[in-house]
Amino acid sequence: MKQKRGKQDVKMVESAPPQLLPKKGRLEISELAPQQRTIRTAEEIEMAYNEAVRKHPFYDNADHTIDFHDATVFRDARGVVGGVLLPGALPAFAATMAADVLRPAAVRTSLRSNMFGGFAPLSGIAGYFDYRGSPVELKCRKTSFTYENVHSWPNVFPMIDYVSAIYKAVFPERWAAQDAAVPDIVRIHGSPFSTLTVNQQFRTASHTDAGDFDMGYGLLAVLEGKFEGLSLALDDFGVCFRMQPRDVLIFNTHFFHSNTEPELNHPKDDWSRLTCVCYYRAALGEPACVAEYERRLARAKEIGASPPPAVDAILQKDNGNNFNKPAPTFTYSLTPFGGAASICSLHCCTAKLLRLHELLLENPTLEVILFGESLRTDDGLPRREKEQLISVHLPVVVKMSPSGGFSELGGALKAAEEKQYFFEEKYLADELGPDLMSMWTQSRAHWLRLVKEDWERLCRRDPERTKFTWNNSSAMNAAFFDLCEVAKQMMIGLLNKETPSSAENHSFWILFAAHLNYACTTENGMPRDAVGMHKLNVKLKDFHFGGTRYLKDMPPEEQERRLERKKRIEEARRRGNAARETHTDNWLLNDTFDYQQEDRKVEFEENGWMTPEAYVKHLGLKPCGDVTAAASPTEPIHVLVVLPRPAAAAPKDVKRDVPLATSEESIRLLMNPAAQRVLTGKARNVTLPSPLSFGGVKITVLFDGDDIDCIHPDFVVLQHLLAAIEEDEAAKARVKYWAHVARYCVFVVETDVRDRRHFLLREEVRVAYEDVAEDCFRSLHAAAYSTKCNRLRTTPSLIALSNSKNIGLRFKFRGSPLNTIALIVVGERLD
């Protein structure tokens, strides 16, 4: 980009925690709000949900066949890349710096409620946006969040630079096309991205990202969080990408995608997740926006704007054809071999895996030989009824606390304690005028001093005391109400509006209380909960409603003094607002040519950080090449299937020990047609089949423990072997052993005793299932393999046996009567 002025070099530093920013809704912090902030009837909630999911349904993990865990390149049936998963690809410091800036960008917005079951999610945009179809009069410019956070915005740049370098390394041609199309004045820090979408605790329903550049990809980065599940799913393809903080996913945002359910032990458990999607908003390169840039530039030159424009002229680039429609999907039947072919660490054997994938599709009977059952069973475990599952949004309606107090339910108190630093002076100074900041500092210090004096007096009477006694007629109480008056004006000043919303009130006052409670501990040396959040909450409500010894009960001269004090506080707040309104209040009216004024150079080496170019080399990233063809039918491929050794032959007249199917759950598990075939059929490991050959493909079947001196397989399939091994260490040793035997990888095929919709089951259904599941699956396993079933495990425990770092993917056998899964364990990465 041609510049009239040089870029300003600045040393990048770790950004401070997010400030309470002066934008509507910025104080609506999800962790601090009650579980439901508005009152809606059950009928209204149901109606909104049904309307939303009619167009944008939610899909659960059980609705998808493959969960990718490791670095992956997933392609459609025509070989076009749909998604590239890169675990841990984003440097930790860059993720943290970006999170600290972008966290407040995610605000409650009804604009995306159709993707959240009719509820307003926490979501926002940063960078540049066209505002096409929006009532905002001035288009094609910085988002309000970027405008209001221009000073901290450069701390996002390291993340942007790394993500851009990753994109360029993996898809150089797509990166170049996107880079060539994006107008220079709306690109974020020289990247091919114009816009960021920031989501917080947002499980999206199925959707496409209309408006993204058709010839490029979007890049999803998980910046921070404590969560399990919430995989990014490509819904039409039946695949999920499991992600954790610092993971990056490059994917076609024009495919329908969504998030699977959060995996919580209890529906009300706390979880957090902050993500950022980087993309080019194609409308910013269309003629209408280019005309807007030209108009603003001409005006800036006419008035001699200072600082001067970053460019001399606006160039209309070739923006390609952007249809804002879902991309065509070319799906194919999924198999464990086809899924494994997508795993990057198995690229050396991709051709062989694709040959096995083709062979399975050509000969479906091989599924039973290799895995013990078909990949899909239509009459097996039936799908759960809607009534057995919890709602996406819990049907809990909590009445909002009156303004001035806060709800003490759920995880709000814990979240407030973690964020109490919002009220520290260094984070408020830039948002409030000096007069109001001085009042806050002095009032806070005065109240803390009086609290300390009262506490020391109480402790002299009782040295073992742990709780503070609040005297409603004390000077400390009066100082607290005075401090609340200052805080109230701070809230109005921060939000820049006289009437904050209920959620903003709630978030502000719970943070305020958490900060004071923390200060009593750290500055006054009091026990952690000596004052306590509950007591502060009660006093805040006293303040709001004119409680004991407040204004209406005070002598006339004291009332007059306090009213005068309140007036001075309001004036201080207004002076502070006036001082900053040129930067914050005027976003709607901002008609300047301020594009790229926020750009700064990132001093990577000065800060001791790897440059993006060096970093992608460090990661070993290479361009996604052409589609790998399946190996020729004559190429030698050896698959070894290992079965559990059967128990000693039992008399034919001895009946199998099958539990009675008396409960609804046991009937579901044992009485479906596929389960009945298992219970009445022949065991799969009574006799070993002879080796099979299909051209160059050889399949050998043997028992665990047999001599394998002359066998050197490419792939090993362990067919329900671990269920016969009770001790985890022994089971882990068998997986490790067979992983060393396999030239490439091992397919661990086992029963998952956990219900596929475990995290969605109503509590009573989950309890009923868990009461009978183990006994039922033991019977099914004994019938299928004629061996004692010593230990059934869940997916997490099976992953633990194989070392989670070695897991490439999980494949779920659809409708399997044994609830079978296959884990791909990459042998070459084992110790």
Curated annotation (Swiss-Prot):
Purpose of the protein: Dioxygenase that catalyzes the first step of DNA base J (beta-d-glucosyl-HOMedU) biosynthesis by converting thymine to 5-hydroxymethyluracil (HOMedU). DNA base J is a hypermodified thymidine residue found in the genome of kinetoplastid parasites, which is localized primarily to repetitive DNA, namely the telomeres, and is implicated in the regulation of antigenic variation. Also specifically binds to base J-containing DNA (J-DNA).
Catalytic reactions on record: thymine + 2-oxoglutarate + O2 = 5-hydroxymethyluracil + succinate + CO2
InterPro entries hit by this protein: 2OGFeDO_JBP1/TET_oxygenase_dom, DB_JBP1, DB_JBP1_sf
GO biological process, one term: base J metabolic process
Listed name of the protein: Thymine dioxygenase JBP1-B
Region described as DNA-binding JBP1 domain: spans on this chain: 409-578
Gene Ontology MF term list: DNA binding; metal ion binding; thymine dioxygenase activity
Oligomeric form and interacting partners: Monomer. Binds to DNA as a monomer.
Binding positions for 2-oxoglutarate per the UniProt entry: 273
Protein family according to the UniProt entry: Belongs to the TET family. JBP1 subfamily.
Organism from which the protein derives: Trypanosoma cruzi (strain CL Brener)
GO cellular component: nucleus
Lineage of the organism: Eukaryota, Discoba, Euglenozoa, Kinetoplastea, Metakinetoplastina
Subcellular location as annotated: Nucleus
Residue numbers binding Fe cation: 207, 209, 257
UniProt EC number: 1.14.11.6
Entry domain remark: The DNA-binding JBP1 domain (DB-JBP1) is necessary and sufficient for binding to J-DNA.
Enzyme class: oxidoreductase
Site (Involved in J base recognition, conferring specificity towards J-DNA): 542
Region described as Thymine dioxygenase: spans on this chain: 80-282
